[in-house]
Every structure is written in structure tokens, then in C-alpha cells.
């Protein structure tokens, strides 16, 4: 018997034929919330990205559902409490996008510190802005990494290649684990006070909602730079906007927003903000890894085999 798996947001091409032979994949990319409620009942598992919401209402009608797979890291679009109540296993693919998000973070950092987007737009407008665009170096700057999981650690390693000093705050990882990478473990408050650049790599959960708020910004160095390619909601966007307007924050580079897309929100429109449309995992390699990893993990869960990335 083949496991019947619903794909709500597509899946990268899988080359493992044995894995494919064990499942029946039904691709319903772009399925609406209403259609999902109507169609999910026959499926043993569903694989989603960030767009599709797996709510208590969905789980209530999904009588055959055994597993929810999240292609990527964040599971804030899945009601984990409801999944546990319904006896549905939730798994993700947390390492598949690590390299891509880490590389984007460094790209945003370099773009911000050297004013690369402004230089490019100036050239396209026929303006030679050489004298106006005086940046600074990453060399010997203090990078504060909030969240030292797979991505945070990968960012730290790449930053060290630029001879940056890396300090890190993570409430879960031990000081020895952080030190082993070459970073200095510090408290959240100390990180805010010492960092020249702050980059965030944490999930958006109750305890991290608006972690960077007015109080946090008040503790930071003047002219600090903020990078976030994690999840919208971990930064209070109004507080960041106020800090940019006051000059406390010299610039920010954001790949994620509280509301996506952010529309005409003034934050991504600010002249000292570089914005990208949540493209951290949008590379060919990351999507291939994520597709294989999540399908393998979902099938393992259905077969009741040991799991690498079980959430609930």
C-alpha cells in the first residue's frame, strides 16, 4: 500500500525512486484554505511550506491524517497544540535551508554596510555617488548573533572568515557549544550593548514575539545595524522604524515581516532599509534538500521509524 500525501505548496524534484515508489503524491499547489478543508480527509500526510495554515479546523476534518511535514524550519503556520491533541505527528526539515539563509544573511550584511543597493540604483539613474557612499568594514566589528542553532552557527562561522568578533545569545545551547565554534556566549542584554551588527536567527513563538522592542533598541550602540532573515514578528516593526528615524539604528536589512507581503508599510520603504521578499530559502540547492529531507521524514513517520526532526 502506498501512503497518500498531499502537497499544498509544491515539492522539488526527488531523484530517489525507491522513496517515490512508496508514496502517492497529489500536487495541489495553490490550494485555498476552503479547498483544503474539503479535500484533506483521504490523505495520510500533508507537506506544506509557510503559506498553508494547518489549523485545528483542518485537523478536525482530516480523519486519516497522521503526519504534517513542514518543508523548511518554521512551524508557526501549524497549530502544534491541536496536532498533539489529534495525535498527528509534525516534522520539519531544519537543516536543508541552513546554507542558503546563512549566505543571504552575509549578503544582506555586506549590502547594508557598503550601501551596495544605493550604489547600483545610482548607477542605473546615471548618478556617480562615489563620494556619498562611504561605508565601513566588517573587519573587527562585533557581530551579535541572537539564536545559535543551525543557521546562527553557520552565520557565525562565515562572519569569522571576515575576521569579525562574534558574540552569541541562545537560551538553549550550552556555553561550551557556543565556545566550540569560536563565538563568545553572552546574555541578551550584553549582546545588545556590545554589538555593532545584530542578526536574528530564532523562531517566532510567544517568548520571542517583539524580542527587539523599544527597550531593546534603547540598550544598543548608536548607529547599530540590524539584520533579520528569521521570522517576522521577532522585531517590533514600529519600534525599529522609530529607531531608524531617530538615528539610533543606522540601517536594517530584512527578509521577513510581520505581515507578508508588507504592502506599503513604511518600514521596507525607509531609505535606510534593504528589503527582500522572504527569499532566504529560495535557492535551487535548498529546495532540493528540503524536498528530499521532508519527504524522507514524513515517510519515516508514517512507517513508524525513528525520526530526526520530530516537533510533536
Residue ranges and their predicted role:
Residues 9-14, 170-175, 259:
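Short, polar loop motifs at secondary-structure junctions
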Residues 86-88, 94-142, 150, 154-157, ...:
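Phosphate-binding beta-alpha-beta segment of Rossmann-like dinucleotide-binding domains, i.e.
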Residues 21, 131-222:
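Rossmann-like dinucleotide/phosphate-binding beta-alpha-beta segment
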Residues 28-29, 49, 71-72, 88-99, ...:
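Short beta->alpha connector loops at strand-helix junctions that form conserved
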Residues 1-91, 213-215, 219:
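An N-terminal-biased, well-structured beta-alpha scaffold segment characteristic
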Residues 51, 73, 196, 201-204, ...:
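Short glycine-/small-residue-rich Rossmann-like dinucleotide-binding loops
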Residues 23, 88, 183, 272-274:
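Short, conserved active-site loop motifs that form the nucleotide-linked donor/cofactor pocket
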Residues 90-91, 223-312:
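Rossmann-like dinucleotide-binding domain for NAD(H)/NADP(H)
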Amino acid at each position: 500500500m502506498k501512503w497518500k500525501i498531499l502537497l499544498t505548496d509544491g515539492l522539488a524534484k526527488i531523484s530517489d525512486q525507491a522513496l517515490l515508489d512508496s508514496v502517492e503524491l497529489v500536487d495541489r499547489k495553490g490550494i485555498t484554505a476552503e479547498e483544503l478543508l474539503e479535500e484533506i480527509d483521504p490523505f495520510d500526510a500533508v507537506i506544506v511550506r509557510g503559506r498553508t495554515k494547518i489549523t485545528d479546523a483542518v485537523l478536525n476534518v482530516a480523519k486519516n491524517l497522521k503526519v504534517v511535514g513542514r518543508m523548511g524550519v518554521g512551524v508557526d503556520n501549524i497549530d502544534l497544540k491541536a496536532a498533539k491533541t489529534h495525535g498527528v505527528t509534525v516534522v520539519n526539515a531544519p537543516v536543508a535551508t541552513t546554507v542558503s539563509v546563512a549566505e543571504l544573511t552575509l549578503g544582506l550584511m555586506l549590502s547594508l554596510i557598503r550601501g551596495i543597493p544605493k550604489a547600483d540604483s545610482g548607477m542605473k539613474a546615471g548618478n556617480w555617488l562615489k563620494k556619498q557612499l562611504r561605508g565601513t568594514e566588517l573587519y573587527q566589528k562585533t557581530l551579535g548573533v541572537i539564536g545559535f542553532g543551525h543557521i546562527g552557527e553557520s552565520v557565525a562561522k562565515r562572519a569569522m572568515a571576515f575576521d569579525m568578533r562574534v558574540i552569541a545569545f541562545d537560551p538553549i545551547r550550552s556555553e561550551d557549544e557556543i565556545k566550540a565554534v569560536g563565538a563568545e556566549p553572552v546574555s541578551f542584554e550584553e549582546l545588545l550593548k556590545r554589538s555593532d551588527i545584530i542578526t536574528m536567527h530564532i523562531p517566532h513563538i510567544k517568548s520571542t514575539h517583539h524580542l527587539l522592542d523599544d527597550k531593546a533598541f534603547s540598550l544598543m550602540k548608536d548607529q547599530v545595524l540590524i539584520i533579520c532573515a528569521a521570522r517576522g514578528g521577532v522585531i517590533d516593526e514600529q519600534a525599529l522604524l522609530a529607531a531608524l528615524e531617530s538615528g539610533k539604528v543606522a540601517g536594517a536589512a530584512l527578509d521577513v515581516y510581520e505581515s507578508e507581503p508588507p504592502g506599503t508599510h513604511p518600514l521596507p520603504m525607509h531609505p535606510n532599509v534593504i528589503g527582500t521578499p522572504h527569499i532566504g530559502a529560495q535557492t535551487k540547492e535548498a529546495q532540493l534538500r528540503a524536498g528530499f529531507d521532508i519527504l524522507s521524514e514524513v515517510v519515516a513517520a508514517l512507517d513508524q521509524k525513528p525520526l530526526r526532526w520530530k516537533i510533536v
